[in-house]
């Protein structure tokens, strides 16, 4: 195994008993990374090392909780809950899986990925809070605008604490636009009173590689199952940290965990209007945070859930699908369709999706954001857009030096000579009448790219 956990002095919290155990847990997991390659010794060596890790983790929990109680730390109850879940649920499930599979490389990798992710989150999120001196202020009385700003700043601060990222919030109304090669991670929580929330983290792959990957000292520039599992559990603890700001979520438990494709994410995003939808540029990749209340739990039979016994296979399948999609998209042109009509967007997307990488936007703001996040080769722009007209959007595109050379073709519902003349005054790269048959529109777009060769 190429990966290993790398200790950094900034992980220290300044409490000797806690720092000492953290370093020991890092060393134990690194032993498992080494032993995983010893085929002949794997079962008994891994079994003993896992037992050693478990014993030290449980002892560490006790020491940590005693220390927090001694200083009357406000986060003790939350810490106990996180410790209990890992001790009583996560570890036993991982142990059983390894035993059932006779400590196969796959099962050991799953154990390592989950424990590494948990340890990264535990060290960089939860335990840093013990000595930070910052009291979590719950946000129940803030106005919506204040909540958005405070939430954004809390995320910026946390990403800096964890990975020293100089993060900027670039939008407080992220519209679900695609950026780079993304991982779409969804957690669903529920209380005994059946109140439900969903959290979706959208992480650009290079962000995972440059953060989680650096802690694991990974050599590859592609995400594998081990790194994905580490990212999952780090993300879960990140969400637990944010969740702690909301009194209503104090007793909420995870009911489902999913890895979504972009298409699945789009459907979920459209169905549940988020209370928070924030977009960040971390300097190492884009990151989006979305939170919404939902009426019902997702259907676990949908195939998205990874809270199953075959979680490893689900994660591997998800990553394989991502690789296939990435390979298929490499040589395809990107087309951004901008229209306020969902009917028109669906029609155009269905028309073009087999030959082009298609993105959609319903407003000028969303269009500009989509262009900034993933530069298209062609923009099909509705000329009769409400609020911000098509000509105004074209003017915004042309005004930005980075976007000025992007081809823009107007879509117009008016085909009379006077209307066409008015459209052409704004010097688009062309125009298409919506009155044309779909096949004719497709032919015109194909010809447009043929002429560009």
Where are these regions (language model features)?
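Two-component/phosphorelay signaling modules centered on CheY-like receiver
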Residues: 342-359, 373
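Receiver (REC) domain active-site loop signature in two-component systems and cognate sites
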Residues: 385
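A Lys-centered signature of the CheY-like receiver
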Residues: 434
């Amino acid at each position: 195994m190429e990966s290993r956990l790398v200790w950094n002095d900034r992980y220290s919290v300044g409490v000797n008993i806690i720092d000492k155990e953290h370093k020991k847990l890092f060393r134990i997991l690194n032993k498992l990374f080494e032993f995983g390659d010893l085929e002949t010794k794997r079962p008994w060596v891994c079994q003993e090392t896992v037992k050693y890790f478990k014993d030290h983790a449980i002892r560490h929990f006790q020491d940590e909780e005693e220390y927090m109680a001694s200083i009357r730390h406000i986060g003790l109850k939350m810490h106990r809950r996180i410790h209990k879940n890992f001790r009583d649920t996560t570890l036993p499930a991982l142990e059983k899986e390894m035993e059932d599979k006779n400590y196969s490389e796959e099962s050991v990798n799953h154990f390592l990925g989950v424990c590494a992710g948990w340890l990264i989150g535990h060290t960089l999120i939860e335990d840093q809070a013990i000595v930070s001196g910052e009291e979590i202020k719950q946000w129940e009385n803030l106005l919506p605008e204040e909540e958005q700003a405070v939430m954004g700043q809390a995320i910026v601060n946390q990403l800096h604490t964890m990975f020293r990222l100089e993060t900027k919030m670039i939008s407080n109304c992220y519209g679900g636009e695609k950026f780079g090669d993304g991982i779409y991670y969804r957690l669903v929580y529920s209380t005994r009173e059946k109140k439900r929330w969903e959290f979706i983290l959208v992480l650009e792959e290079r962000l995972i590689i440059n953060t989680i990957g650096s802690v694991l000292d990974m050599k590859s520039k592609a995400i594998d199952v081990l790194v994905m599992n580490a990212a999952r559990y780090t993300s879960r603890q990140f969400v637990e940290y944010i969740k702690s700001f909301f009194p209503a979520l104090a007793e909420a438990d995870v009911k489902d965990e999913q890895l979504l494709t972009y298409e699945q994410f789009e459907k979920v995003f459209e169905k549940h209007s988020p209370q928070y939808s924030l977009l960040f540029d971390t300097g190492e990749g884009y990151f989006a945070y979305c939170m919404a209340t939902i009426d019902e739990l997702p259907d676990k039979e949908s195939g998205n859930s990874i809270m199953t016994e075959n979680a490893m296979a689900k994660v591997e399948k998800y990553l394989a699908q991502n690789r296939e999609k990435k390979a298929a998209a490499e040589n395809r042109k990107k087309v951004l369709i901008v229209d306020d009509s969902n009917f028109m967007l669906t029609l155009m997307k269905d028309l073009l999706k087999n030959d082009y990488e298609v993105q959609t936007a319903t407003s000028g703001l969303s269009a500009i954001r989509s262009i900034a996040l993933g530069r298209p080769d062609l923009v099909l722009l509705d000329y009769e857009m409400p609020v911000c007209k098509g000509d105004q959007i074209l003017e915004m595109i042309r005004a930005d030096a980075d976007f000025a050379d992007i081809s823009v073709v107007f879509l117009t519902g008016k085909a009379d000579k006077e209307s066409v003349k008015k459209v052409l005054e704004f010097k688009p790269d062309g125009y298409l009448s919506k009155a044309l048959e779909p096949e004719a529109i497709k032919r015109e777009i194909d010809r447009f790219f043929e002429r560009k060769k």
